[in-house]
Amino acid sequence: MRLNSTEISKLIKERIAQFEVFNQSYNEGSIISVSDGIIKINGLSNVMLGEMILLPNNEYAIALNIERDTVGAVVMGPYIHISEGAKVRCTGKILEVPVGDNFLGRVVNALGFPIDGKDSIQNDGFFPVEADAPGVIDRKSVNQPIQTGYKVIDSMIPIGRGQRELIIGDRQTGKTALAIDTIINQKQSGIKCIYVAIGQKLSTIINVVKKLEENNALFNTIIVVASASEAASLQYLAPYSGCAMAEFFRNKGEDSLIIYDDLSKHAVAYRQISLLLRRPPGREAFPGDIFYLHSRLLERASRVSMEYVQKITKNKITGKTGSITALPIIETQSGDVSAFVPTNVISITDGQIFLESNLFNSGIRPAVNPGISVSRVGSAAQTTIIKKLSSGIRTALAQYQELAAFSQFSSDLDDTTRKQLNHGQKITELLKQKQYSPISIAEQALILFVAENNFLDDISIDKITKFEKEILIYAHNYYFDLMEEINKIGDFNIVIKDKFIKLITEFKKNQF
């Protein structure tokens, strides 16, 4: 077989013409030090603050310090296999987490990977962990309530959809219990819940998951976990990841509730990272941007307008408003709310629910101090019937607490003072509530009506709990339609008032 030189030449030219040169440049550097999850990198000239940096073995770090010659980055996870001299490169992206409806009912880590031993999760896309909060024009006023199921909160410290309400108190005062009960109470409301556990013991988190399962509330909840045994970088990231998952529901025109348990441990994790990055420490050794750490997180919680939802979904969803309601938790030391992190978060949020260890230890659960607890925007969102019936409760409690303090110094009290003290004690007893037992709007309305209209005067304090339990059973058995109507419309009128009086009179005459 003879080879034709012309054909060979033609074939070579065709192959050369078809050859494509792929020229892809990378911004590459090398690790010069590794310690405590922090790496120092030399040679990254075009890195962005917060950018993901690709490490060996497909691990990632986030650039947090940009200096003249080096970049300080925090490794997202284990760092044992990382060594000095290893090559790293920029990705040009900020960190994103997977989001979607399929995450409901699952337990995931701070990066969105399932850790509950079940199947992998099919996501509906990725959202950035660091996102801008909606602007003033994109927001809508808070005018719809979130029912916690607690009489003392829904009546005196109401929470609205899109609000940020701080839960603050010493350890072991019922902060997490209050948050979990709020999630349990949302299983019929359609509000999607995200519980972010930061720096908690795994045994505590397992108990939370178990309680939500027992109360049929896990199907509506995403649990994001960065436990005490995990790296500080993941504890720092977890709240932002949870918020990104909540934004997925908000952008669809749905309401979501997110609980950060707790931001004190989040601040400690960030302090640890900052000190390892050699940032200058300030008050209580926290870095200078500790306020911004929490403000940029909590400002993402809001109620957005129909136009915002329409714009962000490119007209796929119209006529709906979305919201993120945030319940951050802060742990205080010996009731000191004037510490650095508590005062920061108090100034960012729209109110606070203060839990006192003295009240908790004396058997008042939830241990809410109504004197210094406040909701700055929730009253506009409060259900009409609860708003009308609870107006005198706070005043009566405030008078009772003032008189109770005064009566310790005087043994000779007049009849009016003694009557006010007795009434205050009965209201305090009536507002007590067991854990994992949230109650409906109608049940709250009936109990508040009893307290407001002096139907407790002839009942001794030790029988208040029994009276409350039995009157609710009686109401559901004989006035079921009335209770359903109140739950549906949430309004108060003369007809409902007359029916309440009839119900209470009949019950006290025949049953109690």
UniProtKB/Swiss-Prot annotation:
Keywords tagged on the record: ATP synthesis, ATP-binding, Cell membrane, CF(1), Hydrogen ion transport, Ion transport, Membrane, Nucleotide-binding, Translocase, Transport
Binding residue positions for ATP: 169-176
Subcellular localization: Cell membrane
UniProt-listed Enzyme Commission number(s): 7.1.2.2
Classification via InterPro entries: ATP_synth_asu-like_sf (IPR023366), ATP_synth_asu_C (IPR000793), ATP_synth_asu_C_sf (IPR038376), ATP_synth_F1_a_nt-bd_dom (IPR033732), ATP_synth_F1_asu (IPR005294), ATPase_a/bsu_AS (IPR020003), ATPase_F1/V1/A1_a/bsu_N (IPR004100), ATPase_F1/V1/A1_a/bsu_N_sf (IPR036121)
Enzyme superclass (EC): translocase
Pfam families, per the entry: ATP-synt_ab, ATP-synt_ab_C, ATP-synt_ab_N
Source species, domain of life: Bacteria
Cystines in this chain: none
Catalytic activity: ATP + H2O + 4 H(+)(in) = ADP + phosphate + 5 H(+)(out)
GO cellular component: plasma membrane; proton-transporting ATP synthase complex
Site features described as Required for activity, chain residue numbers: 373
Membrane topology: Peripheral membrane protein
Keyword Cytoplasm on entry: no
GO molecular function: ADP binding; ATP binding; proton-transporting ATP synthase activity, rotational mechanism
Function summary: Produces ATP from ADP in the presence of a proton gradient across the membrane. The alpha chain is a regulatory subunit.
Subunit and interaction comment: F-type ATPases have 2 components, CF(1) - the catalytic core - and CF(0) - the membrane proton channel. CF(1) has five subunits: alpha(3), beta(3), gamma(1), delta(1), epsilon(1). CF(0) has three main subunits: a(1), b(2) and c(9-12). The alpha and beta chains form an alternating ring which encloses part of the gamma chain. CF(1) is attached to CF(0) by a central stalk formed by the gamma and epsilon chains, while a peripheral stalk is formed by the delta and b chains.
Family: Belongs to the ATPase alpha/beta chains family.
Name of the protein described by the UniProt record: ATP synthase subunit alpha
Organism: Buchnera aphidicola subsp. Acyrthosiphon pisum (strain Tuc7)
Phylogenetic lineage: Bacteria, Pseudomonadati, Pseudomonadota, Gammaproteobacteria, Enterobacterales
